[in-house]
């Protein structure tokens, strides 16, 4: 396939509002890919590089564009572009930055104007074309003539869509069947939706399992004989950073385990340290021995995906917890209460808050483990409203904030239309250290110059925002605005694809309106 065909598909999908039309266009493009092009082509349609990040920022890409002129006509094939990107990604050592820049310039010099724009945005991670994962799952299913549910299940197991698309297009249902839980290979974590309170959570779930919501780092721990590996929420292998977790799981008698839980730094009295303290244990360059002494970690588990040779993902939560309790002692399990009684639930919530924890998770007793999904089977209850939003832009500050990029433009994810929907701005809640850190980070994420009052950013950073409510607003395209928003913390453990959706925000607003009316 020629690159120009994928570029045209991307452009049409970006300009198309209807979900079904997007799916049809994407399915046609996927069908047209040759076997050796499928992994790269599916990755590009998902707005990402098969090679991952390749170490070129906006300045380098802009310089490559300025140093070359567009080709008169499109002539690049998908295979040769992918091969060029392989060479870019492989550049290492002294002078590798210059080598990557030269390779990119050589590629752009052979590309037409439309292809250059596509490639530049792809390299920078800015290819927002309205083809988010839900739409692509349906497109892969149509192109491969397999059920969308099977594609979705395979993506949950694989942790990414492109390899699933490649397998489905090559072998159909047989290819998808190979994606299953494997020891020492992480799967996407199951996620929770917000609920206004315990009464709302119990009304939705009936009798439910309530668990303390710990403000720690999500970990997925795999054990296969004597080998233990620990993976972060983003599926990064963090085993060397958390020897306490490894040792705790290695001591468990079961020969094989996959456990979901939280690693958390606790003070001597059992109260949690701030989230930022726990996250110091998960940096890229660590003095593990020193940090272990200064910031010791505890681990508490709340789910079992596999025990003693048996996969449990498809089992009801009640059965998974029985397996967890059989494999893991009380001291390593999150406190839990099964109830349908509102008073008992409220008391359990108060107990969690009194000990310094965030709140509760209310979980359906009958639901399977829906890896990678933020479904209605898990509901999180906190004292204050919070949302995980994406920073779309920032404004230069004044007064105490002069010289810092501070006033954040905040957006919710829009899976249907693609991209993000702005909900408001805030500079509240930021410490001096946070202002300095984010200003440096925003410079690296800037789309174009940072000289103007507003600096637009690549939508890569997720921030947890507390707010007092939502109000209708004609100022923002979603029709809603945050009321008294303030920053709680950056969620470097979350990807933009894991931010809260505009549908979640609208549901919160609907519940708020109903509560105000007494309905």
From Swiss-Prot:
Signal peptide: none annotated. It holds the Pfam family DNA_ligase_A_N. Keywords: ATP-binding, Cell cycle, Cell division, DNA damage, DNA recombination, DNA repair, DNA replication, Ligase, Magnesium, Metal-binding, Nucleotide-binding. InterPro entries: ATP-dep_DNA_ligase, DNA_ligae_ATP-dep_bac/arc, DNA_ligase_ATP-dep, DNA_ligase_ATP-dep_C, DNA_ligase_ATP-dep_cent, DNA_ligase_ATP-dep_CS, DNA_ligase_ATP-dep_N, DNA_ligase_N_sf. It comes from the Bacteria. It catalyses: ATP + (deoxyribonucleotide)n-3'-hydroxyl + 5'-phospho-(deoxyribonucleotide)m = (deoxyribonucleotide)n+m + AMP + diphosphate. Its cofactor is Mg(2+). The active site is at residue 213. Its EC number is 6.5.1.1. One of its GO terms (biological process) is DNA repair. It is an enzyme of class 6 (ligase). One of its GO terms (molecular function) is metal ion binding. ATP binds at residues 211, 218, 233, 262, 302, 374, 380. PANTHER family: DNA LIGASE 1/3 FAMILY MEMBER, DNA LIGASE-RELATED. Belongs to the ATP-dependent DNA ligase family. DNA ligase that seals nicks in double-stranded DNA during DNA replication, DNA recombination and DNA repair. HAMAP family: DNA_ligase. This is Probable DNA ligase. The lineage of its organism: Bacteria, Pseudomonadati, Myxococcota, Myxococcia, Myxococcales. The gene is lig.
């Amino acid at each position: 396939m020629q690159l120009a065909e994928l570029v045209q598909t991307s452009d049409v999908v970006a300009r198309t509002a209807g979900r079904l039309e997007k799916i049809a266009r994407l399915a046609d493009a996927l069908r047209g890919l040759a076997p050796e092009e499928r992994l790269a082509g599916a990755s590009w349609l998902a707005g990402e590089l098969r090679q991952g990040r390749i170490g070129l920022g906006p300045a380098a890409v802009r310089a490559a564009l300025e140093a070359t002129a567009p080709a008169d006509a499109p002539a690049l094939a998908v295979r040769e572009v992918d091969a060029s990107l392989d060479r870019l990604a492989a550049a290492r050592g002294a002078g590798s930055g210059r080598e990557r820049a030269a390779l990119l310039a050589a590629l752009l010099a052979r590309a037409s104007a439309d292809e250059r724009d596509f490639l530049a945005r792809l390299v920078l991670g800015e290819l927002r074309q309205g083809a988010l994962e839900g739409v692509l799952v349906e497109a892969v299913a149509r192109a491969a003539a397999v059920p969308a549910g099977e594609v979705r299940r395979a993506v949950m197991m694989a942790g990414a869509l492109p390899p699933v698309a490649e397998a489905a297009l090559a072998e159909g249902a047989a290819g998808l069947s190979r994606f299953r839980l494997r020891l020492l290979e992480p799967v996407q974590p199951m996620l929770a939706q917000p609920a206004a309170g315990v009464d709302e959570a119990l009304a939705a779930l009936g009798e439910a399992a309530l668990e303390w919501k710990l403000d720690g780092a999500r970990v997925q721990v795999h054990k296969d004989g004597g080998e233990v590996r620990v993976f972060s929420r983003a599926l990064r292998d963090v085993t060397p950073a958390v020897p306490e977790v490894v040792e705790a799981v290695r001591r468990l008698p079961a020969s094989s385990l996959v456990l979901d839980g939280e690693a958390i730094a606790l003070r001597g009295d059992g109260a949690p340290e701030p989230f930022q303290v726990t996250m110091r244990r998960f940096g890229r360059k660590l003095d593990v021995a020193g940090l272990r002494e200064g910031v010791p970690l505890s681990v508490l588990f709340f789910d079992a995906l596999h025990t003693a040779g048996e996969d449990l993902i498809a089992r009801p939560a009640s059965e998974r917890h029985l397996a967890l309790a059989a494999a893991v002692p009380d001291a390593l399990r999150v406190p839990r209460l099964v109830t349908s009684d509102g008073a008992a639930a409220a008391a359990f919530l108060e107990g969690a808050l009194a000990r310094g924890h965030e709140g509760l998770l209310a979980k359906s007793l009958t639901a399977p483990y829906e890896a990678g999904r933020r479904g209605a089977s898990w509901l999180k209850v906190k004292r204050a409203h919070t949302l995980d939003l994406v920073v779309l832009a920032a404004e230069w500050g004044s007064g105490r904030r002069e010289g810092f990029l501070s006033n954040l433009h905040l957006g919710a994810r829009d899976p249907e239309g693609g991209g993000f929907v702005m909900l408001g701005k805030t500079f509240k809640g930021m410490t001096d250290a946070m202002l300095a850190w984010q200003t440096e980070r925003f410079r690296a994420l800037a789309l174009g110059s940072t000289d103007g009052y507003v600096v637009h950013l690549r939508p890569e950073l997720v921030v947890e925002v507390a707010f007092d409510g939502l109000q209708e607003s004609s100022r923002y395209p979603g029709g809603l605005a945050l009321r008294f928003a303030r920053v709680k913390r950056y969620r470097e453990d979350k990807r933009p694809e894991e931010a809260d959706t505009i549908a979640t925000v609208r549901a919160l607003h609907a519940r708020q309106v109903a509560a105000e009316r007494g309905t």
